[in-house]
Amino acid sequence: MSAPPVRIRDLHYAVGARPIFAGVDIDVPQGQITAVMGPSGTGKTTLLRLLTGQAAADRGRIELFGESVGELDKARLYALRRRTGMLFQNGALLTDLTVFENVAFPVRAHARLPESVLRRLVLTKLEAVGLRGAAELMPSQLSGGMARRVALARAIVMDPELLIYDEPFVGLDPISMGVIVRLIRELNETLGVTSIVVSHDVEELATIAHRSYLLSEGRVVAAGTPEELARSGKPVVRQFMSGAADGPVPFHFPAGDLAADILGRAQQDKLPRGRL
């Protein structure tokens, strides 16, 4: 059996004294949509930076297409990135280029194609996301949902083997969100790619993911199909899946006794300013 496109083993990573990951294991099967979920601040986007070599792990191993990301030189890492398409959280469109030229940008940077071939390629990708008619518009003329779709067309223009989505549903209205969900599913099926979707939108992911991982406090606390996670008896998993305001992830930030805190402040206010 061949190795999965993405394999993460015993991943450790910290920012200063703050641990972000402490022994994370993840497998992303070929041709499937894998969801990576977790509360805000759990390091989901950081995980993508580590996966694509934008940051280096403190310990552990990250394999992309069977190669250890941490052991690659710049040239080899660059070659692997060309096999990967990424939809950034903010879309990251170039504001001074038309929709057409935004999608064409990676092709112009990495390949030398006749203009007729390039045009056919770009228009085909825009057609796939429903925006061929918007090819000559500027990014400032697009809605948030349209901009996200243009960015997706750009992500697939080089026919990647792996598609990575970083919070693809953030800031979208229900219709635009439904469009993105549909596109993720359809592109995965028609292009035969492997997809990683990083998000905390449980309902949307449940409709498209083959397998889900839930991160919390630096570890994978649950892994399985969306249905298996929904049936989990683990308190932290149940809280996240149901959206409960309090639980293992507490409502209150850690603090001392309220009465003592108020009383202490009141006593300080009574002291002459020179004695504070």
Residue ranges, per PLM feature:
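Conserved ABC ATPase "signature" region
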Residues: 67-68, 115-133
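Conserved ABC ATPase signature
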Residues: 138-142, 146
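Helix-to-loop junction immediately C-terminal to a conserved catalytic motif
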Residues: 52
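The feature captures the beta-strand-to-loop junction immediately N-terminal to the Walker
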Residues: 37-39
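Catalytic Walker B motif of ABC-type/P-loop ATPase nucleotide-binding domains
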Residues: 163-166
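Conserved catalytic motifs of ABC-family nucleotide-binding domains
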Residues: 159
